[in-house]
Amino acid sequence: MVGCAPTTTPASKFEPNYLYAHALGKLEDMVLDQPLDDTQDLLTEWFGTLDKPALPPLFAEDEYKDLLTLSNLEKAAGPPAKTAELGENGLYRQLCASCHGESGQGRGPVAASQNPYPREFRHGIFKYKNTPRKYKPTKEDIAKTLRRGLSGSQMPLFNKLTLEQMDALVDYVVFLSIRGEFERKLLYNAAYEMDLEKDRVYSVSFKGSQDSESKKKYESQMESAEEILTGIVDVWVESADSVEKFEMPDFPIYGTETDENRNQLLESIEKGKKLFVSEEAACAKCHGASGSGGGTQLPDYDDWTKDWTTKIGIKPTDTDLLLPLMARGGLKPQPLVPRNLVEGKFRGGREPLELYRRIRYGIVGAPMPAATVVKSSDEKGLQEADLWHLVNYVLSIAAPPEAAIETKALVASPLPKRP
């Protein structure tokens, strides 16, 4: 099994994913120390360090060169300014790392005290986005979360950042996500596709070797790694054009009604109310019949937690068995609390189209499933109009939005100094 995470990570080094490596090792009864070390060598070569980020060679190719820019990564990376004012670089460490962690591991110095915990970027999963379920968010989706914050959580809004600062932070979040997902898939590939007694994820000593056998092995390692990375980056590129357009219904949406069509809206709300508690929509199972969150569904956990608990056969409530995993980076599992829709605090936005997409696509990483959309009432599921009826009902029971808080670019508590 992989050893415990060190108390500190060497200056400028990303923290290895000890948690995932240990979970994989426990699940398959294998030792992943060498693959984890090999993975760090390749990650450093391709993605650089916390203070000096780099882009893998793949990003020089035409179809990928616009996804991330090194200049943006350099603005976000590195040590923060020594004053409360934002500097020319170090934006991520100054604004985000105290919660999300320097490596995007979701475990910054203040993370354990929060509920819900800050997002862990290394899975490559984002809950609030406008793209279909299988896609990544667009950059605008990430920027929108930064500008608006997440109501009902400790995620603040950063609505005073300049366009350049926002672009830098968004690029860096995507960078951390790609890097983290690449690390996970390298480890997964080592566990399930390699003979660890004979093969290595990456042999840095083979680089530049003139020995034919070493050269052959190195080329094979590079080919495998490039294939894995390309698969990850392709989804990000494809996601930029994946946002679907939906036609508005022929009845009014809550907040847009007029005296002439108000009765149509009331009819839609009533239909939405009935659908809300129906078996087809099943909203009430989690959100309760009144929408206040008191459903009958048993406590559940997000996919980040399940990744190192239920997926490897450990209950999230079995603290004794979880201690070795928590020592390697896991935070004590928190059961999810279904949204109290009556409060009107909608993470990810409360615009009708945003709520429609959330119902249609579900929330990736959370138990909320995608709707089963059908074309006729003869089929089991929800029709397009039903989704809009649900939107109208939810908006009708929700408290009005709170006034936006004007804020400067918020500065989180400073991180502890490196040893």
Model-derived regions, located:
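Sequence/structural segment immediately N-terminal to covalent heme-attachment motifs in c-type
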Residues: 81-101, 264-289, 296-314, 390, ...
